């Protein structure tokens, strides 16, 4: 995993799992709102009244509608050991 994804993926995944409403600002200034349905290396699926595929290279900023807590390395170890 590249260094850039070590923060991006857990952040987007937390927003997705907790169904946090987000505002996504594009580089051209357009504001999109909805919930993150899914994402991969290149795109984010944003769901509102319709689903939109937003290319990450077009995104300037992702703003959550409420504060989110990112999982730490210790949290990941605890959840893995809890599955034994």
Curated annotation (Swiss-Prot):
Annotated keywords: RNA-binding, Stress response
Highest taxon, organism lineage: Bacteria
Transmembrane segments: none
UniProt GO MF annotations: RNA binding
Signal sequence, renumbered to the chain: none
CDD domains: Hfq (cd01716)
Pfam family, one: Hfq
InterPro entries named in the record: Hfq, LSM_dom_sf, Sm
Keyword Membrane: no
A cellular component term, taken from the record's GO annotations: cytosol
Gene Ontology BP, a term: regulation of RNA stability
Domain Sm: 9-68
Subunit structure: Homohexamer.
Function: RNA chaperone that binds small regulatory RNA (sRNAs) and mRNAs to facilitate mRNA translational regulation in response to envelope stress, environmental stress and changes in metabolite concentrations. Also binds with high specificity to tRNAs.
Family per record: Belongs to the Hfq family.
UniProt name for this protein: RNA-binding protein Hfq
Gene: hfq
């Amino acid at each position: 995993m590249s260094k850039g994804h070590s923060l991006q993926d857990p952040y987007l995944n937390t927003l997705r799992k907790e169904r946090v409403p987000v505002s996504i600002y594009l580089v051209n200034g357009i504001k999109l709102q909805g919930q993150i349905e899914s994402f991969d290396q290149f795109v984010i699926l944003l769901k509102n009244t319709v689903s939109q595929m937003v290319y990450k290279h077009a995104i300037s900023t992702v703003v959550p509608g409420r504060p989110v807590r990112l999982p730490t390395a210790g949290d990941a170890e605890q959840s893995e050991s809890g599955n034994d």
